[in-house]
Structure formats: C-alpha cells, structure tokens
Design a protein with these regions (language model features):
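ATP/NTP phosphate-donor binding region
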Residues: 1-48, 52-67, 87
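Glycine-rich beta-alpha junction loops
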Residues: 118-122, 181-184, 209-210
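Gly/Ser/Thr-rich active-site loops/lids in small-molecule metabolic enzymes
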Residues: 135-144, 188, 194-214
Length: 271
C-alpha cells in the first residue's frame, strides 16, 4: 500500500493533484510514531508538502528507525530542500537518506532538528512578516524577496553579533543575516551557502554585514546565484560542527521556514 500524507496547509493551501483512488491521510492529524511503527514492510509513504512538512516529520519521528521507503511529492511555497537536491516538483522523490544525521538547534529552550537552514536576522524577520500576512489573508501568495527588500530598506535594523565556531570567537557589527546552513538554499531559492554539502560533517555559517543599506540592497540579488560570497567585505563564511550566534537585541529566527520570536541567541550542532 502507498500512503499519501498530505499537508493541507502547505503552499498557502493550494492542493497538489494526486493519483486517483490513492490513500490520502491528513498529515496534520496523525501520530507519526503510531503510523510509521505499524506499517507493513512493503508499504510506502509519500509526503505531500514542503520544507515545513519534512521538518515536522523529522521532529516527530526518529527517522533512523524507518523501514519503509519515504518519498517527497513537493508542494511547498519555497521548497529549499528540493532546490538543494536538484529534483523536480513533478515527481515523487525517494528521501530516506536525507532524513537522518541532521543538525540540532537550541533556541529559547527548544531543541529542534532541521533539514535545510535556520536563520537569525532579516530572514527571520521575513518569516515573521509572512506569518502576519498569512494570518490576515491565508490564500495570498507570499513574496519573500519583496518582504526582504522592504525590511532591508525600512523595517529591519542590523544587529551586533558575537559568534562562536568550534570554540573560536568572532564579533561583528551591522549584521543583517546570520544563517547556519545544512543545505545550500534559503528563502525559496536563494543560494546562501553555495559550497555547503548536506552530506558533509560540517555546517556553514554565513554572516552578511554592512553599514550601508544601499550596498546591502545592491548585493542582495546576487544571493540567488550564490555570487554574493565573492564580496568578502560584506559576506563572511565559517564552517564547523558546533556554532552559536548571539545578537545584542532580540529578533525572529526561522527554522526550515517556521518562526521563533524574540530570540537573542541560538546554538546548533551537527554530531
């Protein structure tokens, strides 16, 4: 039997066309432990959703125990995971090997696994604003790039940051972004860490720092192709297994697109 675990909230509620007469289950209503532990060996599972759907899976089930093939039939608004592995939204993609050995982030007393990225600063602000828009207009398509540009110019204030990478300490002023990347992509197609490999034994921290809003704005479009890293006066990269970032003032963090508000510090580790 092939089960389709559909997240009705993904892609702003826009439904994905599924095969006729297939077994569809609402992924938001089930107990993942009961569901996966009671599958027959020949059963298969298709996750229908986006990055948030996969994040929910890895945080509600120990995927190292999986005995069945699990596929992604992508239906997200950003699909950073799909961008990173170079697959299409038009087919079911086997994903078992991507669901284990994941980094863990500690933030505001929570411990969360993530598949793609977690970001402090402007990106977290964008997710916070997107949540507000969704609350007011649930079916409205979110323009994350537009939110980011408006935030950069008018709303978001850069922070002072202290970072620690495998015991080495650094300090930066005027920090706009401080994502720690397990994959290469963030924000629905921005190639934030072009050299990151999700199968490596390290994470990549990207620090985007500049006193000038205009310079920051002019460089911003180059993130989509990963060319921003050539501007080493603005973009700093660090690789390590254990990374922490502390800001001087609280702001939002996003973890695979899910927002955590009022964060001063996060730490993340890939064991």
């Amino acid at each position: 039997m092939k089960y389709y675990l559909n997240n009705p909230l993904s892609n702003n509620g826009i439904k994905k066309k599924l095969p006729e007469d297939c077994k569809i289950i609402d992924a938001t209503t089930i107990d993942y432990n009961d569901f996966f532990d009671n599958l027959k060996p020949e059963d298969e599972v298709v996750m229908v959703g986006g990055d948030g759907t996969l994040n929910h899976l890895v945080n509600h089930y120990d995927c190292s125990k999986l005995k069945n093939n699990v596929y992604l039939y992508a239906n997200g608004s950003g699909d950073d995971f799909l961008h990173d592995i170079g697959e299409s939204k038009d087919k079911e993609v086997l994903i078992n090997k991507y669901l284990v050995n994941l980094p863990i982030v500690h933030v505001n007393g929570k411990e969360v696994k993530y598949l793609n990225n977690m970001s402090f600063g402007l990106d977290g602000y964008c997710c916070e604003e997107a949540d507000r828009i969704k609350a007011k207009t649930p079916k409205k398509k979110i323009n994350y790039s537009g939110i980011a540009i408006k935030g950069l110019l008018f709303k978001f204030k850069p922070k002072h940051a202290w970072i620690n990478v495998d015991g080495k300490e650094y300090e930066f002023d005027n920090v706009w972004l401080a994502p720690t990347m397990h994959g290469r992509y963030v924000g629905g197609g921005m190639k934030m860490a072009p050299g990151q490999d999700r199968f490596s034994d390290t994470l990549t921290l990207v620090i985007y720092t500049s006193k000038s809003k205009i310079k920051s704005l002019m460089l911003f479009p180059s993130i989509f192709k990963g060319e921003h890293v050539k501007n080493t006066d603005v973009v700093k990269q660090f690789t390590g297994k254990k990374i922490s970032v502390r800001f001087d003032k609280p702001c939002a963090v996003q973890i695979d697109g899910d927002t955590v508000l009022d964060v001063i510090e996060y730490s993340t580790e890939l064991k």
